[in-house]
Amino acid sequence: MQMVINEMKQKAIYPGTFDPVTNGHIDIITRASTIFPELIVAVASNKNKRPYLSWESRISLLEESVGHLTGVRVVGFDNLLIDFVLEQNAGIILRGLRAVSDFEYEFQLAGMNRKLSKKVETLFLTPAEHLMYISSTLVREIAALNGDISQFVPPNVVRELKKRQNERSL
């Protein structure tokens, strides 16, 4: 039994909507890839929200952004996170914390996931200091007003958001 638990702890899931993926997300994924032999970046379909980018687009942009990292896989999911984690035989949920304001929600989420399965732990990483203020919401707002988002997101995301802005202005 102990060996199975240890194997599960070798695989982490980093879930999110990634709408769009930011340099803060990439920082956490890059650093986590050096900690865990296997990291699954799990892109939530999140039917309750109206995403700016399609699920397929978000998955594709992430694959392009982290494809060079060893042991990292990008997967979409549309079920309960804890069920997805167990289906993947993972033992760690990795979450990013930007500010104290994120902590309360993340703390509640971690507690709920712990109630749903004692086999899974939640770990938190903070992005690099210069990336802590970046959020997908702020990036979308800046992009919508034709602002320069190149310092906040990977180049492929800049291109995709510009393309979307051009399509909307037609």
Curated annotation (Swiss-Prot):
Query: Which cofactors is this protein said to need?
Result: Mg(2+)
What InterPro entries does its record include? Cyt_trans-like, PPAT, Rossmann-like_a/b/a_fold
**Binding site residues for ATP:** 17-18, 25, 96-98, 106, 131-137
Q: Which reaction does it catalyse?
A: (R)-4'-phosphopantetheine + ATP + H(+) = 3'-dephospho-CoA + diphosphate
E.C. number: 2.7.7.3
**Segment forming the signal sequence:** none
Q: What class of enzyme is it?
A: transferase
Q: Which Gene3D superfamilies match?
A: HUPs (3.40.50.620)
Marked site, Transition state stabilizer, at 25
Places the protein is found: Cytoplasm
Binding site residues for substrate: 17, 49, 81, 95
A GO cellular component term found in this entry reads: cytoplasm
Pathway(s) of this molecule: Cofactor biosynthesis; coenzyme A biosynthesis; CoA from (R)-pantothenate: step 4/5
Question: Looking at the record's lineage, which domain of life comes first?
Answer: Bacteria
Q: Which SUPFAM superfamilies match?
A: Nucleotidylyl transferase (SSF52374)
Q: Which GO terms describe its biological process?
A: coenzyme A biosynthetic process
What is the protein's major site of localization?
cytoplasm
Listed under subunit, the entry gives: Homohexamer.
Q: HAMAP family under this entry? A: PPAT_bact
Write out the function statement from the record: Reversibly transfers an adenylyl group from ATP to 4'-phosphopantetheine, yielding dephospho-CoA (dPCoA) and pyrophosphate.
The protein depicted here goes by the name Phosphopantetheine adenylyltransferase
| Gene symbol of the encoding locus | coaD
